[in-house]
């Protein structure tokens, strides 16, 4: 399990992960099928099951960096994910953005939110500002009674630097 430091956990994201997946990654953009390589990965949240298959996939991923000079590891994974799935049989689960959101695709409902990643946000100050506001809103949400929460989506009200 590897994750960026700009991710808030509101609930346990392992509840959303399939035991059948060899690798699980968050998504910048999610298109409905958790196993479709058409989803765009965000390796800020990455889990890999220990196996020969995943070790081979990580080795291929590392070697592939030479074929894509100037691209960072997430961009390289995006380039080779179809090959990893079709040729190596790697089962990659892309976490849906309704439950594991980011600033790119702000789900805005605390009732369904597991994690929030400060992606699509430039600068540590901006990330800390918006994540701090979000954490304050989460605390207010947690202080609500169950009846208030069950009336529908509980949305946060923070206009931020990166969250709009």
Where are each of the predicted segments found?
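Catalytic core and acceptor-binding pocket of nucleotide-sugar-dependent glycosyltransferases
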Residues: 48-164
């Amino acid at each position: 399990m590897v994750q960026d430091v700009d991710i808030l956990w509101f609930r346990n994201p392992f509840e959303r992960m399939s035991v059948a997946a060899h690798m699980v990654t968050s998504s910048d953009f999610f298109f409905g099928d958790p196993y479709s390589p058409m989803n765009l990965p965000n390796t800020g949240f990455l889990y890999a099951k220990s196996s020969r298959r995943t070790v081979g996939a990580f080795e291929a991923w590392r070697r592939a960096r030479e074929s894509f000079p100037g691209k960072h590891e997430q961009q390289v994974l995006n380039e080779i994910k179809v090959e990893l799935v079709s040729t190596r049989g790697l089962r990659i689960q892309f976490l849906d953005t309704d439950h594991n959101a980011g600033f790119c695709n702000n789900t805005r409902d605390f009732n369904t939110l597991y994690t929030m990643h400060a992606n699509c946000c430039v600068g540590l100050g901006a990330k800390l500002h918006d994540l701090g506001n979000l954490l304050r809103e989460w605390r207010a949400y947690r202080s609500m009674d169950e009846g208030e929460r069950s009336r529908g989506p509980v949305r946060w009200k923070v206009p931020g630097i990166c969250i709009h």
